[in-house]
Amino acid sequence: MGKGPGLYTEIGKKARDLLYKDYQSDHKFSITTYSPTGVVITSSGSKKGDLFLADVNTQLKNKNVTTDIKVDTNSNLFTTITVDEAAPGLKTILSFRVPDQRSGKLEVQYLHDYAGICTSVGLTANPIVNFSGVVGTNIIALGTDVSFDTKTGDFTKCNAGLSFTNADLVASLNLNNKGDNLTASYYHTVSPLTSTAVGAEVNHSFSTNENIITVGTQHRLDPLTSVKARINNFGKASALLQHEWRPKSLFTVSGEVDTKSVDKGAKFGLALALKP
C-alpha cells in the first residue's frame, strides 16, 4: 500500500476494475511505436456494430512535462499537457479539444500523506467547477466530490465516499447522484501468488428502490494468462481471458450471456494491444 489516501477516484477502484475493466462487446485494436527521440505514437481502432472509429495519439515527454495530442476520425483534435511534480505532490493538467472552443479545462491535483485534492475549472466565461478531496490514511479515508455550475448557480454533482484498506481487502461505500444512489463494494485478495481475488458490488437506487448486485472473480492461470468472470442479479454473466503473448502486448477475448434469455444469443468482444 502506498502512502496517503490517494484521490477520490481511487475509492472503490479495486472492486470496479475487477468487475468491469477489460470487459467489452466490440472489437478493438491498438499498436504503439516508440521513436529513438522518445516520441510515443499509438494508433487505435474499434468496431461497434457497423460503426468503425479510429484515432492516433502522439505523446511527447520533456523532463516533467508530458504532451498528448490525439486526432480521431471525426476530425477532433484533443490536446492534454501534464506538468508532474512542479512542486512536491503537485500535478497540473491542461486539456482542450479543437474545434470545440468551450472544451478547455485546467485541473490541479495534490497528494499528501493525509490528503488528496483534485480541483478543475472549465476555461469558459461561466465554467463548471469541480472539487474532490479525501482525508485520512492509506488504511481509512473519507472524501467528497462536488461540481458547481457558475452559470445556473446549482450543484450538478454531489458525492461522498468512504474506504477501508488492509493487506488483503478493500471495502468502500459511496453515496452518489446527490444522495439517490448508495454503492457498497468489496475486494478481497485470496492468493497474491496467482492474483486470485473476489469482489462484489451492491448498488441501491432510492428513487426506484432497485438493487443491482454484481459479484466477480479473477485468477492467473500462468504468468502470462489470466481469467475473470462476473454475474449480476439480473442473470447477466460475463467471462474474460487475457493473454500477454509478448511483454506489454495483450490479447483479450470476452463474452456476455443473459442466462434468463439465452435465445437472444451471446455478445463477444476482442481486443489486441501491441507494444514493442
Curated annotation (Swiss-Prot):
The keyword Repeat does not apply. Keywords: Ion transport, Membrane, Mitochondrion, Mitochondrion outer membrane, Porin, Transmembrane, Transmembrane beta strand, Transport. One of its GO terms (cellular component) is mitochondrial outer membrane. GO terms for molecular function: porin activity; voltage-gated monoatomic anion channel activity. The keyword Transcription does not apply. InterPro entries: Porin_dom_sf, Porin_Euk, Porin_Euk/Tom40. It is found in: Mitochondrion outer membrane. Its main location: mitochondrion. Coiled coil: none annotated. Consists mainly of membrane-spanning sided beta-sheets. Forms a channel through the cell membrane that allows diffusion of small hydrophilic molecules. The channel adopts an open conformation at low or zero membrane potential and a closed conformation at potentials above 30-40 mV. The open state has a weak anion selectivity whereas the closed state is cation-selective. Belongs to the eukaryotic mitochondrial porin (TC 1.B.8.1) family. This is Mitochondrial outer membrane protein porin of 34 kDa.
